[in-house]
Amino acid sequence: KELDFWETIDKPLILSEYGADTVAGIHGFTPEMFTEEFQVEYYRTINGCLDERRFVVGEWPWNFADFSTQQGPMRVGSCNRKGLFTRERTPKLAAHYFRDRWSKKEPNDR
């Protein structure tokens, strides 16, 4: 519902810098935090909300690739792991999810 306010402004919206920490190679039968499945499910949920709103014209997840940063209580080690790729540029499941999502032919077929 928070997105609905932005429709009243009558301007196109691009959502950026949204993501979920994921440790590459960690998998689960259910999408538990830090698994690659959780990251994909997180994006599916957020993007489902975006897809329902015609004024949303774009998206850019945070981040392209994992990167070093300071430690924090909600972070595994000293690395921001919200990347679609690892620091070595190995794709995570989310990279494949976005490849499929962004490969659709129609501009409004997100």
Predicted regions located by residue number:
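Substrate-binding clefts and catalytic carboxylate motifs of secreted carbohydrate-active enzymes
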Residues: 1-110
